[in-house]
Amino acid sequence: MTVFAASQQSAAGAGMLPSHQARLACRAGQADTTAGVAPGYVQGNLAILPEKFAAAFHRFCQLNPKPCPIIGMSDVGNPMIPALGLDLDIRTDLPRYRVWRDGEVIEEPTDIMAHWRDDLVAFVIGCSFSFEEALLADDIAIRHIDCKVRVPMYRTNIPCAPAGPFAGPMVVSMRPMKPKDAIRAVQITSRFPSVHGAPVHIGLPQSIGIADIAKPDYGDPVPIADDELPVFWACGVTPQAVIAAAKVPFAITHAPGLMLVTDLKNKHLAVL
């Protein structure tokens, strides 16, 4: 049993929200993927930037709502985002982070206490893990959960709309499905626009610039059966690609597949 799973069982007995318990497990140094953790609760990608870049990045997200739907944002210099969760501290409550300098990852710590500054603004961006609960409820299997690995993610040739220094390709996540399940997945995920919504592409990975489906740019590869199609969703790792391209002097993000678990409920994100 993972620490996350054990923590959630303990949380149920203590009356603590599973989402809060998941964050406490992160503070204790737990670094598992958060796929399947705290079912029913919204998870988010993270991008933290100096205030001088925050307005341009906010505009970038507004222009690219499929890969970058903002679900929360901190005040300048404040690591707490109470609208997203009880006692939520953006510096400690993810399993692992990436620290960037001039577009390069220089460190992947389990907390960012030593890197926090008074001029930083945190953006929490919707994550496709939130709609996976709805897929599972409709008996659509999620391969990376079954395989206990991180979801595979790929840089594509789909351009994002630029804003200030931020421009670059969309990143997508992939889940293999039988054709009938892919059709149903389009219907289900269309109800969740604040966590990427419907797929952006189905099948033929090379037509969106993916040369080798077995070699994801982020996350882990998963097997695809002969009777399955790769189904691609816009992904909240897109900011990491544009931060790298912009060579921002300093930034912090989540490590791909290792998300912030919030106290928001997935069911409250559905629009239909």
UniProtKB/Swiss-Prot annotation:
NCBIfam families in the record: PRK05463.1
Family matches, as PANTHER family: D-GLUTAMATE CYCLASE, MITOCHONDRIAL
Keywords of this entry: Lyase
Pfam families reported for this sequence: D-Glu_cyclase (PF07286)
EC number: 4.2.1.-
Record carries keyword Lyase: yes
One MF annotation (Gene Ontology) recorded for this entry: lyase activity
InterPro entries in the record: D-Glu_cyclase, Putative_hydro-lyase, UPF0317
Name the record gives this protein: Putative hydro-lyase RPB_3621
HAMAP family: Hydro_lyase (MF_01830)
Membrane-crossing segments per the record: none
Protein family per UniProt: Belongs to the D-glutamate cyclase family.
